[in-house]
Amino acid sequence: MLYPAEYDITILQNATWKGTFRATQNRQVVSNIDVATATFTCDCHGLTAGTKVVITGGTTIPCGLTLNQIYYVITTGLTTSAFKLSATSGGAAITLTGTATGTFYVATPLDLTGYTVDSDIKGLSDGASIGTFTPTITSATDGAFELALTPATTAAFTTGRYGYDVSLTASGGERYYWLTGVATVQKTYSRN
């Protein structure tokens, strides 16, 4: 069973809205990042050399680490509770400087090959549809996709709070609700 993540958004009337997302799986808490050695600690992580991962979360992000970017686990420093990352498959370890604070997570991207993405906006109380996002898978093997709304679509939205969700449907018909949230539509005042 997949439980959707929650992410609230704001949409401006009569404006383009775009969001870039990455579907991930097997998320685990990183208990420590040793910036000096660029070593990530995560007990019993189960990762192997060459595995694609992304790092998310954190309060203070060390220099040299980009959140939600694809990295590769490397053999150097790999144990059952620690790993190092490279920006390229089989490449050298990334270098980190500064400090790392807050809770970080490691996850593997979901391969979206053969999947379709669907996302609708509906009334929170009545469930009436007010619009549909245009989804585009930008890198299937990296789990990356975009959702977009055109100004013509958002111009028809009434200001207020709505619900939205994102579903991922596999080629075999299995459907998962990956993301849900509140979409707040705000009025704009500029001339067209």
Question: What do the predicted segments below correspond to?
Answer:
Residues 27-109:
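Small/polar beta-strand repeat architecture
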Residues 1-26, 107-192:
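Contiguous segments within soluble domain cores/interaction surfaces
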